[in-house]
């Protein structure tokens, strides 16, 4: 690092134009700046500084402090100045170093201003001209630290962050997790154990994997990377319906749907801190000499749209949504598990721009309720998942009633994780977590209040007086990854199987809702007539025209979890009725076809519909496994 330190009567600047393709995002207020009676510090961050930027920051701050104390300066102007060196660091590293110098000087009590990075700027200053008014410094890191080592240190810092664990009851009682009586809350106890132990590796295959294979829904793809799956027609139908359902719910809530790229530039300055957190978990793509990473959320694209948008206070809260197909994370191979943890996944992702904390908390509560509603629609009630709420001690002390209200809404005790200080970008977060048959938990719905990224990405809104303001941002996935929803549905049914209860999909998600079984070929025409009527009513139906015996046909339908089995013979044909086996209650009844249609439509009203994913006749279908 090269530094030129000038004690000046004043320093002022004005941004003229971009010097980099992706400069630091700035507001209109940041396009000009001035400080009087100031120590101006012109800085070139060099290539060698990349080996240990943290050491360079510490040394630079110490040198600046030494000079400031000698000249008795209380104001410091950090000014990016590329012209002190011909061996410059990468823009993302340079910006990180400059930001950290600014932050650390401010923490030490100085009034600090930093000129924007990545722009051509005009500037004026007036050097005081005394013996210490013009000084230069060169800083060289003594110990080279690789980027990988820096990120290992970051992960270690996160792991060492002390968590305080409590159970919060709907009555508002906050109880140390070791003192809570878990009687009647055994699933919560399993979730607590999982969270505190943080053991993500399963020692055996979870039951949903067997079910997804048996049902010919989803399978492993040996021709791809681990954690990338193939979907057979029935699995694709379920996944597609879930995608449509969640998207419709979010748009109904008031979000605007967008679409953004799946890859982003490694050197984009606003993305640097995201990327450095978990570098080993990114897929990297090269295009020419440039490196790109595959997104692991929709945040990047939506934030960049918001940065370029003109947003008024009248537009707030502003909700934006994308269903990412796909998001990518190179999860550790030992943590990959069926549909529970993948490397390529489909994430419904909504981001809300909120004016202030009051509006953000109001949205947080609404999105909490929205998430409950979305999960209810896929067959998951509060009895099926456990709630975790995470925040700092300060937030709890200032917003206790708000947190207690969340426990009241869910109507049962929730897990609290509390920190003494904020390490992450959010100040409040909840997740609805499904605990599976191996006592492993997976987060489904989640909402976070983000206090950092609006500033990092340069997202602004204009208030009533036309002044630029920095908002807060809520991250919301009302269902969690679509694959995880499928995992939770299958794991819940596996639990029911263990209790001797017949497993079922929610009716609107059943790939085949009705199977028609003719007792003989002579009533095949009537079987096809019945199927045609049902199909005309937008009910997914098929016909077992194979040569199997009747009992075997019924067993096949049972194994496929088909909700309604219609058996038609000569009697039904003559009377124009159907004999229905209802899976939900095990009853067999004779009824008019119109009554069955009415019953099914009543249960699927309000949910999306897609046609049957396979041929009408079973004899025409391929077998995808075995």
Curated annotation (Swiss-Prot):
CDD domains: ThrRS_anticodon. Residues 1-145 are annotated as: Editing domain. GO terms for cellular component: cytoplasm. Keywords: Aminoacyl-tRNA synthetase, ATP-binding, Cytoplasm, Ligase, Metal-binding, Nucleotide-binding, Protein biosynthesis, RNA-binding, tRNA-binding, Zinc. Residues 207-506 are annotated as: Catalytic. It catalyses: tRNA(Thr) + L-threonine + ATP = L-threonyl-tRNA(Thr) + AMP + diphosphate + H(+). Belongs to the class-II aminoacyl-tRNA synthetase family. This is Threonine--tRNA ligase. It comes from Thermococcus kodakarensis (strain ATCC BAA-918 / JCM 12380 / KOD1).
């Amino acid at each position: 690092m090269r530094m030129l330190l000038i004690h000046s009567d004043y320093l002022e600047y004005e941004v003229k134009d971009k010097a980099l393709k992706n400069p630091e995002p700035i507001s209109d207020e940041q396009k000009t700046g001035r400080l009087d009676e100031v120590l101006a510090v012109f800085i070139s961050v060099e290539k060698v500084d990349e080996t240990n930027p943290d050491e360079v920051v510490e040394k630079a701050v110490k040198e600046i402090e030494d000079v400031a104390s000698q000249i008795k300066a209380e104001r410091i102007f950090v000014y990016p100045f590329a012209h002190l060196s011909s061996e410059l660091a990468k823009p993302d590293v340079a910006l990180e170093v400059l930001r950290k110098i600014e932050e650390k000087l401010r923490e030490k009590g100085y009034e600090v201003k930093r000129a924007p990075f990545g722009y051509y700027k005009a500037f004026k200053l007036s050097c005081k001209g005394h013996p210490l008014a013009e000084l230069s410094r060169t800083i060289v890191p003594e110990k080279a630290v690789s980027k990988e080592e820096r990120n290992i240190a970051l992960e270690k810092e996160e792991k060492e962050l002390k968590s305080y664990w409590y159970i919060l009851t709907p009555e508002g009682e906050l109880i140390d997790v070791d003192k809570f009586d878990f009687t009647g809350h055994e699933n919560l106890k399993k979730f607590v154990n999982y969270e505190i132990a943080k053991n993500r590796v399963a020692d055996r295959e979870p039951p949903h994997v067997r079910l997804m294979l048996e049902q010919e829904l989803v399978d492993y793809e040996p021709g791809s990377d681990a954690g990338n799956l193939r979907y057979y027609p029935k699995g694709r139908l379920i996944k597609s319906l879930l995608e449509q359902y969640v998207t419709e719910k979010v748009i109904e809530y008031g979000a605007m749907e967008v679409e953004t790229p799946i890859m982003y530039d490694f050197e984009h300055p606003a993305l640097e801190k995201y990327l450095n957190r978990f570098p080993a978990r990114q897929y990297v793509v090269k295009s020419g000499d440039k490196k790109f990473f595959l997104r692991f959320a929709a945040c990047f694209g939506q934030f960049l749209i918001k940065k370029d948008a003109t947003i008024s206070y009248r537009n707030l809260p502003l909700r934006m949504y994308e269903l990412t197909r796909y998001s990518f994370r190179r999860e550790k191979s030992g943590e990959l598990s069926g549909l529970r943890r993948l490397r390529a996944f489909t994430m419904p992702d909504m981001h809300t721009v909120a004016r202030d904390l009051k509006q953000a908390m109001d949205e947080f509560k609404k999105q909490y309720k929205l998430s409950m509603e979305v999960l209810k629609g896929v067959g998951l009630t509060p009895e099926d998942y456990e709630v975790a709420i995470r925040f700092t001690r300060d937030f709890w002390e200032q917003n206790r009633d708000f947190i207690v209200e969340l426990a009241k809404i869910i109507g049962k005790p929730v897990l609290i994780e509390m920190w003494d200080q904020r390490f992450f970008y959010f100040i409040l977060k909840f997740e609805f977590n499904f605990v599976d048959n191996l006592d492993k938990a997976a987060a489904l719905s989640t909402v976070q209040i983000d206090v950092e990224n609006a500033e990092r990405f340069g997202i602004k809104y204009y208030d009533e007086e036309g002044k630029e303001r920095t908002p807060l941002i809520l991250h919301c996935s009302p269902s969690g990854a679509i694959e995880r929803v499928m995992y939770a549905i299958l794991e819940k049914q596996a639990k029911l199987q263990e209790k001797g209860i017949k497993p079922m999909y929610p009716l609107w998600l059943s790939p085949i809702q009705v199977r028609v079984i003719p007792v003989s070929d002579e009533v095949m025409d009537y079987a096809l007539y019945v199927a045609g009527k049902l199909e005309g009513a937008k009910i997914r139906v098929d016909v077992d025209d194979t040569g199997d015996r009747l009992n075997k046909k019924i067993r096949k339908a049972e194994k496929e979890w088909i909700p309604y089995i219609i058996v038609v013979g000569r009697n039904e044909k003559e009377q124009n009725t159907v004999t229905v086996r209802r899976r939900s209650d095990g009853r067999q009844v004779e009824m008019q076809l119109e009554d069955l249609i009415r019953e099914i439509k009543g249960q699927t009203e309000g949910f999306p519909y897609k046609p049957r994913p396979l041929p009408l006749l079973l004899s025409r279908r391929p077998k995808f496994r075995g």
